Amino acid sequence: MSPRNRGKTIMAGEDEARARLNAARAFVSVAELVYAEPDDPVLPLRGVAAAVAVLGGIAAADAICSVRLGEMFRGDDHTQAVDLLARAQPEGARVRSDFVRLLGIKDKVQYQAIIVTPSEAATAIRQSRRMLAAAEEACSPR
């Protein structure tokens, strides 16, 4: 891959959509459980909750794209993943802004030694929940 093309799509169908939907459910559940625990300086659980919420949003986006487009994103350039999700009508377009916000905090919560506020973590979990609801809608039998 060239430096400009840091992502690709892979073929995906109903099986992949179901698997990614189940992963999204698990990530969102774990984020909620971790968020409910008391935070302390040694164990920064709010950051962990937000990081897991981001993973839930990514898995939900994969589920939506798999079922609506027959493909999902793989790579480092998440702007391409946002573009793919926006094409996955109608659910992807509806939660695009939540996905953009989750990806916007990804580096902070996963790679930086920065304290995540309770408000930031709660917002990430809400965004991830909305994405999960959209993925469940997209994957529900018609």
What are these regions (language model features)?
Residues 1-142:
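Terminal alpha-helical segments
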